[in-house]
Amino acid sequence: MSLVCAIALIFTLFPQIEAKALEHTQTAPLYIYSKDCPEEYMEYALNTVGDFLGSSEYNDITDPWIGTPFTFANPESNIYYFPIYDNGKIAYTFRVYKTYTGDITGILSEALVNDLNEFSAQTNAENPLKIYCKDDDSIIFSKEDSPSSLSFENSANQSEAGMDGSFVVIECKMEDKIEKTVRPRGGDSYINLFPNINYIDVQSGDNYWCVGYVAAAILNYTKIDVTITPKEFMKLYGITDPKKGTYLRNLYYYLIADYVKGTGKFSSSALSFLDMAIEIEEGRPVAISMRNIKNTSTEEGVGNHAVVVRGLDSYRAHFSIWNPWYRFYESIVTLDSYTPAISSTREYSYSRDGRTVYGIKNLA
């Protein structure tokens, strides 16, 4: 998944949130072209993000503030990103959207953080940022002579954003102080597995080898095979073309081979929350395949995406996952709905036609 950088223009303050006195001054406001955020999304974010930040996973966040939300410049865009500031700088984004069931959910991660911090110093009221997501899930940061001058390269969206008047330019800035949810004594059970993924050569989603990356991360963490790479794993199953994937069950077949001592189990369905929690608490990362519910293919594996469940906050029932498209982890409210950060066309569900490899012993 490539990132293409360039930027866009105009001005209007976001009208729905009243700014408060700040304890710390942010490095620079970010002017961005967006639709106004629905009130229910703002209420959800304000009521939820403190639950995430109250976990020991985020102990390094000492002065959190939530910022003005924005969305992509696509006409159909309905995922809103709330910048989460720490000591005046964007540290995370909290993306909020409605699931296929109509419920609101949120995901906290470092998605877009580096780009937003970089562009904030380059934007102003007359020269705002415009973010456009293409069908191939690439992002364009655009800077043009006018907000309407960027012609969409996406054949499905030939009309230009904002022509209906729904888009304005907002000043994205620190808005409300976040109060971290205080855990009762002994109530914070946050467990992180394989905290360092830098040894994995992440390809940022530019191929179909998500199972290979998930397998390599888990196998290296468990010391089952400390040298295997995603490429080597995929080659075991005759795959060298980056446009071809493999089934999650092949990780299971690898695990139960004689030289791996028979560790691992496979399920053609999703684990319950309790069973998933037991795996994490026992130090066993779980590989899952999530179904793209917007993909209508009936062929097994088509439209699926593999991620690793590698952390658990048992107090608020939040999981931490690693999507092999990214070099960071994500805290997620529910595994029933997952929309990647750089997408407007995909929604994955683990509970609907999910696959699971679990019981993976740590042999270190």
Positions of the model-derived regions?
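Bacterial N-terminal signal peptides
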Residues: 2-12
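Short, solvent-exposed coil/turn segments at beta-strand boundaries
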Residues: 75-79, 87-89, 97-103, 124-128, ...
